[in-house]
């Protein structure tokens, strides 16, 4: 395993651990999700170059588009939950209380 692969795996693992352990605020969960998507995007961008397959070059761009949609939806949920509940704490977002 090369240093490049190890750095992508460690970035994805650290961001997923951050998502698992820092679950108090919605903004921290969104930042961890975005770092997971960024590390996945970088790994998918390098993979077709190393494998020398030009047919997979569209996959990172498609994943980046879905990541932008996810970020926009997450920020809209953050604004809506902050307006209705007064904070971005995840324990306030219980569906049984609404």
Curated annotation (Swiss-Prot):
Q: Which keywords are on file for this protein?
A: Electron transport, Membrane, Mitochondrion, NAD, Respiratory chain, Translocase, Transmembrane, Transmembrane helix, Transport, Ubiquinone
Q: Which Pfam families match?
A: Oxidored_q2
Chief subcellular location equals mitochondrion
Q: Which InterPro entries match?
A: NADH_UbQ_OxRdtase_chain4L/K, NUOK/Mnh_C1-like
For this UniProt entry, the molecular function terms from Gene Ontology, in alphabetical order, are: NADH dehydrogenase (ubiquinone) activity
Topology in membrane: Multi-pass membrane protein
Which is one Gene Ontology cellular component term of this protein?
mitochondrial membrane
Cellular location of this protein?
Mitochondrion membrane
The job of this chain, per UniProt, is described as: Core subunit of the mitochondrial membrane respiratory chain NADH dehydrogenase (Complex I) which catalyzes electron transfer from NADH through the respiratory chain, using ubiquinone as an electron acceptor. Part of the enzyme membrane arm which is embedded in the lipid bilayer and involved in proton translocation.
Question: What is the recorded name of this protein?
Answer: NADH-ubiquinone oxidoreductase chain 4L
Species source reads Struthio camelus (Common ostrich)
